[in-house]
Amino acid sequence: MIKKFLLFAMLNIFLTNKAHSNEEIIEISTEIQKEKYIPFLISRGKTQLEDLVKYTLEINPELDKNYVNTVAKTYIDESLIEGVNYDIAYAQMLLETGALKFNGIVSKEQHNFSXIGATNNLTKGNSFSNITEGIKAHIQHLKAYASKQNIKSNMVDPRFYLVKRGSAPTIYDLTGKWAKDKLYDKKLKKILLELLEYNNANKS
């Protein structure tokens, strides 16, 4: 019985490792080691609040620090409630908003940090009453794609039930679903990797 269990466990490990190519595994370099992980949307973030803020201000120095701090902290708080990886959510926000410049069709006043509802160049997307509600909607929308788990807070995402639940467990699955851009996952991975490297650089 024990031998059968061990064989089953080893087979599962083998299949899990084979399911993802080397390109899909993110390596975070440090002076001591290389950490490898597959960026699942339902997982725990690794960065610190201060690193999210510093990184954002480096790529967009014109931002108000208090505003960035509020946005970053809210991303961490709302992600932890739903079990979503806040590193991924925050990196996606930076991609969708152009590092909070809001140069696209969605305006800052909409508090829409993930372009929910902005399905084409003529649709401005959904608007939310404040920062927290906008970020909560983003996290809920990610969770809709990531899993079939229930939402733990009040529903604010107006497009939650339009998503095929559990259809995008990793960042690579978002391409063609969240956005039509064929390079969407690569752009998101680039920002995510920069965030993680920035965090680890400040630890060493």
Swiss-Prot record:
<dbReference type="GO" id="GO:0004040">
    <property type="term" value="F:amidase activity"/>
</dbReference>
<dbReference type="InterPro" id="IPR002901">
    <property type="entry name" value="MGlyc_endo_b_GlcNAc-like_dom"/>
</dbReference>
<protein>
    <recommendedName>
        <fullName>Uncharacterized protein BB_0531</fullName>
    </recommendedName>
</protein>
<keyword id="KW-0732">Signal</keyword>
<dbReference type="Pfam" id="PF01832">
    <property type="entry name" value="Glucosaminidase"/>
</dbReference>
<feature type="signal peptide">
    <location>
        <begin position="1"/>
        <end position="21"/>
    </location>
</feature>
